[in-house]
Amino acid sequence: MKLYDTLTKTNVDIDANEINIYVCGPTVYDHIHIGNLRPIVTFDVLRRLLEHSNKKVNFVHNLTDIDDKIINQAQRLNLSEEEVTKRYTSAYFEILDELNIKLPKIVKVTDVMSGIIKYIEKIYDKQYAYELDGDIYFDTTRIADYGVLSKRKLDEQISGIRVKSNENKTSPNDFVLWKKTVEGIKWNSRFGLGRPGWHTECAYIIDQEFKQKGFVIHGGGIDLVFPHHENENAQNLALHNKNLVNCWVHVGYLLIDNEKMSKSLNNFIYVKHLIESHNYRAIRWVFYNTAHTQPLNFDGTIIKAAQKDVEKIISTVNRFRTFLIANKNNIPSSSLVCEEFKKALFDNLNFANATKVIWDLIKVLNESIAYKKIDENIWAYQQLIWCLEIYGIVPDMIHNEQIIDQINQWSELLNNKDYEKADSIRNKLINKKVL
């Protein structure tokens, strides 16, 4: 398998039998929007693909549950910070479940605070950090390769930290490792009361979870390349003299009316609202027709088209299941590897080519129904189910005992040429969306 690596700007071979994946999670101060969802769905597909290819996958996902945004939201809602993070963490988990996302290992920042503090102390003791007005800053001038990921010249860069910048820093690119504060939840450290910087939280979790061993893929949105991922990498260079991961995979922007979707622009769509009005499979399908690295313009037409596509897929699967039963076959309980689909996704997650394979299989199933060649094409059904498993959108099995009995009655009536009664049952099956 090959994946495009942001750092080397080349396709990197993913040959290891055990793969470590880390994807930056949300700051749990609000519900996630559809732009937040794209990396989650993309890496869920990658995980499923690797696991279906007999790879062991260690997938870690963080939750940032301390941040100025959380403090501000708590004040707005007249809640404690813990109440805010609990509310939106629970909402996030509900969305992952409703969208059929295989749950990664979740690491909350507050659960690993003692380790983060020790991590900062190590950086400081190696003289890659300095104190300024009570805050601890990472000294980016000590890293010769600073900018290696984002390919930016130092004078083009900005700190991009989530707190107000100090003009007296050694370099404008220096970022906070430890922020002195009297507001909100805080921890004691040798640097005084405060809390860690955002960039350090993720860098520590990756270091702690994977121990600088194995093949590591780091994923996230393209907007995180700089400064977040650049600064994660800088800390690893300081402590271990090596880049943080083996492959950086960044997912393209989601656009609304050709503008980046973001809460700051107030042009976002909450995922929870989409789920209320659309099949979760359609929401996932939106991401399966465009290269994951490219921008995706989201509007009403794209979700409507996805809904229609998914309805066609579900209809074909259910109809084929019905004709399997009518032909006295069992519905296969196992799938078959679809090599063409796998080949497409192994080529840097080529969603366009992979999705074309699905439509080719749909065509085979529809033709097998039309020309009464069900038995000869069971393989196509099994391959289609395998593809849909990777995409996380396998149609539910709605052929219960009652429906199976009706299908058998319908088939028997047709064989006996009792067409009037057969049509009556056929209409019932159509209403149940299995014919």
Curated annotation (Swiss-Prot):
Q: What chemistry does it catalyse, as a reaction equation?
A: tRNA(Cys) + L-cysteine + ATP = L-cysteinyl-tRNA(Cys) + AMP + diphosphate
Keyword annotations from UniProtKB, A to Z: Aminoacyl-tRNA synthetase, ATP-binding, Cytoplasm, Ligase, Metal-binding, Nucleotide-binding, Protein biosynthesis, Zinc
Which metal ions or organic cofactors does this protein require, according to UniProt? Zn(2+)
Matching InterPro entries, A to Z?
A: Cys-tRNA-ligase (IPR015803), Cys-tRNA/MSH_ligase (IPR024909), Rossmann-like_a/b/a_fold (IPR014729), tRNA-synt_1_cat_dom (IPR032678), tRNAsynth_Ia_anticodon-bd (IPR009080)
Where it mainly occurs, coarsely classed, is cytoplasm
Task: Identify the residue span(s) of motif 'KMSKS' region.
Answer: 260-264
Task: Detail which positions bind ATP.
Answer: K263
- Motif 'HIGH' region covers 26-36
What gene does the UniProt entry assign to this protein? cysS
Protein name, as recorded: Cysteine--tRNA ligase
